[in-house]
Amino acid sequence: MANIPMDIITDLFLRLPASTLVRFRVLSKPCFSLIDSPDFIASHLNHTLQTGDHLMILLRGPRLLCTVDIDAPDKVSDVEHPLKAGGLTEVFGSCNGLIGLSNSPTDIALFNPSTRQTHRLPAEIVDFPEGSTTRGYVFYGLGYDSVSEDYKVVRMIQCKGGKADELVFGFPYEIKVFSLKKNSWKRIKRVLPAIQLLFYFYYHLLYRRGYGVLACNSLHWVLPRRPGLIAFNTIIRFDLASEEFEILDFPESLAHENIDIGVLDGCLCLMCNHEFSYVDVWIMKEYKVEGSWSKLFRVPKPKSVESFDFMRPLLYSKDRDKVLLEINNAKLVWFDLASKRFRKLRIKDCDSSYSVELLVSSLVLGCRGDPNEVKRRKERRAREDKLMQQSNKRDDFLSKGFKLVL
């Protein structure tokens, strides 16, 4: 490759999956420097996001964590992750090739399955509000703040115990945000009174036990209606740039329906389940503009499922004639928008229930995930150079010694 111009090599490398590029780093020092450079990592990610190439599905089940190539469902790869232990590790989000992993509120990591790079978050204790002694539910969110070019993790904890158990409704809460750039946590104290009231008096978030939905530089959750307590649904958003909560408007006609949220084609979408017989999918074409919500399509209950409890659109096919749907955390099906027919996506050796995340192939965390990685790499290279020099001196000594004997 020494005779190939570097710009041609760069253009070629941009089209390759991250797992291949990791192996290509050993080809030469220029290749190593190129693939590890922040500029190339960013360019490779942008190219992958724009083209939709090397897109994978991450499956998470009771004893399962694997990636599946969407274009080749028989290509299944088990994921060995750093938090693997006897307990059940949660996968609480996917963003630019990274996934969030958690064994507990103080044992969290960012992990890139394509490169196997890991960043363990510093353990952050729970600052229990006065009168609370234990934690209840824990809700997470993972996202990329394009304003500060930083990956962030949101951790929200419902606290209970002591005087908190005497409350008629709900419990106090704690919210903290982790910044990868700063490698530190920050407590969020300023919350709008309306949201503070919702959090304090009733705290039950939808979407996978409260995993935030990332769209338009914000994480989103649904606070569902609760008969006898709260009569309407609420969507809250956490702006990753300002690190503030807001209430997001959506069609008033859906305020009393069974709803959930997701992302389709980069836009926030809303799924309205009508008596578990069909689901209407709405999309917000212009973010934070209530009038931009429009009903996109309707999905009838498939004959192959007994109940239609949960449905989420994941992505369009390349010809945009079909949509890949996740149904009941157990099935992946292609839904033809014209014929309204379903076709199951069959995955090799996978018949159990699972949750799904979309995953892109990226080099994120490749060179700067761990703040000490660059330092360790330099030290490792220095040791290797020293060993090489010692080896060369020994070879010179032996060759001179043999000459003397001869």
Regions found by a protein language model. Give the residues of each.
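N-terminal entry/capping and adjacent linker segments that precede and initiate structured domains
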Residues: 1-406
